Amino acid sequence: MANAKEIKTKIASVKNTQKITSAMEMVAASKMRKAQDRMAASRPYAENMRKVIGHVAQGSLEYKHPYLEVREAKRVGYIVVSTDRGLCGGLNVNLFKKVVADVKSQREQGVEVEFCPIGARSVQFFNSFGGQVSAYASGLGDAPKLADLIGTVRVMLQAYNEGKLDRLYVVFNRFVNTMSQTPVIEQLLPLPKSEVDEVSHHWDYLYEPDPKELLETLLVRYVESQVYQGVVENLASEQAARMVAMKSATDNAGDLISDLQLVYNKARQAAITQELSEIVAGAAAV
């Protein structure tokens, strides 16, 4: 058994760690609320953009945009959104597991893959995982802007336009609630047809001035909005996961302190008992 002094030092060390994790929990809680507000503000735009694009895709178009045409999948791209920092539980690990499983399934069918990681953890993972990394972005901070993503996203769009990619997916952690974040893989291109649009009647649109120009702009904005929404959803998920992880660490530190305090008391008791025994033995010898 360690002596009382060593145990006391250990208790002090764990208490200091507990203060740090408790502070990190409070910071994460504050950042999570801001991230939730940002996510809630952008979600209606992303959802309505998806509905509009899905509805347009069902119309009888004079011009058929390449983003609406399904072609044989020979090479697919993944835009994978992760965190820049760690200490957020298994958030990134679960996301990477889902991507790896999907990539394995694609490769078994003879499909090649390439990646566009967003977030330092994603960049680090895919550099070591293997596979072509065509573009990346990191260091977006706690208030990411669409302008910071446009260049990266357009690298993947250019590859799709040139026929180098036949499918494009975005992967991120969807924020469900504080205790639950779900990794999802959503197809961006070719444009997936929503179930609502499939059962509703189709509309014919009159385009002014030109359907090609309109769709070129609208579809690019659609892809950018979906990727941005994935980034802000992932940020809210990150702060929620970090808050939960730090709360768990703080609670575990408290349990460890209680256990160490018990060991310390036993060590003190043993030391005092030994001293008394030595005194009694010395007195008996005299």
UniProtKB/Swiss-Prot annotation:
Pfam families on file: ATP-synt
Gene3D superfamilies with a match to the protein in the record: 3.40.1380.10, ATP synthase, gamma subunit, helix hairpin domain
PROSITE patterns associated with the record: ATPASE_GAMMA
Keywords on record: ATP synthesis, Cell inner membrane, Cell membrane, CF(1), Hydrogen ion transport, Ion transport, Membrane, Transport
InterPro entries: ATP_synth_F1_ATPase_gsu, ATP_synth_F1_gsu, ATP_synth_F1_gsu_CS
Keyword Calcium on entry: no
Top-level taxon of origin: Bacteria
One GO cellular component term noted in the UniProt record for this chain: proton-transporting ATP synthase complex
Chief location: membrane
SUPFAM superfamilies reported in the protein's UniProt record: ATP synthase (F1-ATPase), gamma subunit
Keyword Transit peptide: no
CDD domains in UniProt: F1-ATPase_gamma
Membrane topology: Peripheral membrane protein
Coiled-coil annotated spans: none
GO molecular function: ATP binding; proton-transporting ATP synthase activity, rotational mechanism
Localisation per UniProt entry: Cell inner membrane
Subunit relationships: F-type ATPases have 2 components, CF(1) - the catalytic core - and CF(0) - the membrane proton channel. CF(1) has five subunits: alpha(3), beta(3), gamma(1), delta(1), epsilon(1). CF(0) has three main subunits: a, b and c.
Biological role: Produces ATP from ADP in the presence of a proton gradient across the membrane. The gamma chain is believed to be important in regulating ATPase activity and the flow of protons through the CF(0) complex.
UniProt similarity note: Belongs to the ATPase gamma chain family.
Protein name: ATP synthase gamma chain
Originating species: Shewanella sediminis (strain HAW-EB3)
